[in-house]
Amino acid sequence: MGNKINPNGFRLGITKGWNSRWYAGKKQYSQLLKEDEKIRKLVSQKLAAAGIARIEIERAGQQVNVIISAAKPGIVIGKGGESIKQLRGEIERLVSAGTVAVNVAEIPNPNISAPLVALRIAEQIERRFAFRRAMKQAAQRVMESGARGVKVILSGRLGGAEQARTEKVLEGRVPLHTLRADIDYGTARAETTYGSLGIKVLVFNGEVIGGKTETLARPPRKSDERRREDGERPSRRRPTARRRPGGE
């Protein structure tokens, strides 16, 4: 089941929270759900250059609070706050009732944000980058930024092939069944001349123990440190062949 289920939904209520936080009756539920989808679509299209990783919506009474997690919050706010005021007005036209408040949260390390990594790979593929190179470079950047592991999955007509297939790149460790594992999950779609390519990214940042994420990193061995300082590669000795009794 680890490969078949959404990692965010699998850990919902344990290490992950809800993107929409409100309560409604049977008559209003479908209407508010449609409004949330329209708000997310508007923000994602209008602020694509800001690197939007997550859009959270809270409703309490007549108040609607939209929290945007972005890699470049300056683009969301705009000069003198003009962009965010314009965005608030457009969201108010989508909401049936209530006042709208828009808050912006900055992502401290965009390189380990799975949605942003997936979007970056999609942009490179649409610019005709080699898909294997884009996947490997993205995985290396994630590991260099302090993640414990990353898995990149690309599916579709890769390289214009007649038959669709799936390519995977795995660096480090990415547990799928550990519920306390802090795994960030993101998807994106690359539109090419041969069709659409689906991109999935899973980033493992450590394990959540006592409400805090612990990296559980292994300390480097002394032999490894000496090899790094000397710049020598570890020698690989071949096992010596043992002669059997009675043999030549």
Swiss-Prot record:
Residues 235-248 have a biased composition (Basic residues). Residues 221-234 have a biased composition (Basic and acidic residues). Residues 212-248 are annotated as: Disordered. InterPro entries: KH_dom-like_a/b, KH_dom_type_2, KH_sf_prok-type, Ribosomal_S3_C_sf, Ribosomal_uS3_bac-typ, Ribosomal_uS3_C, Ribosomal_uS3_CS. PROSITE patterns: KH_TYPE_2 (PS50823), RIBOSOMAL_S3 (PS00548). It holds the Pfam family KH_2. GO terms for molecular function: mRNA binding; rRNA binding; structural constituent of ribosome. One of its GO terms (cellular component) is cytosolic small ribosomal subunit. One of its GO terms (biological process) is translation. Residues 39-108 form the KH type-2 domain. Keywords: Ribonucleoprotein, Ribosomal protein, RNA-binding, rRNA-binding. HAMAP family: Ribosomal_uS3_B (MF_01309_B). Part of the 30S ribosomal subunit. Forms a tight complex with proteins S10 and S14. Belongs to the universal ribosomal protein uS3 family. Binds the lower part of the 30S subunit head. Binds mRNA in the 70S ribosome, positioning it for translation. This is Small ribosomal subunit protein uS3. It comes from Deinococcus geothermalis (strain DSM 11300 / CIP 105573 / AG-3a).
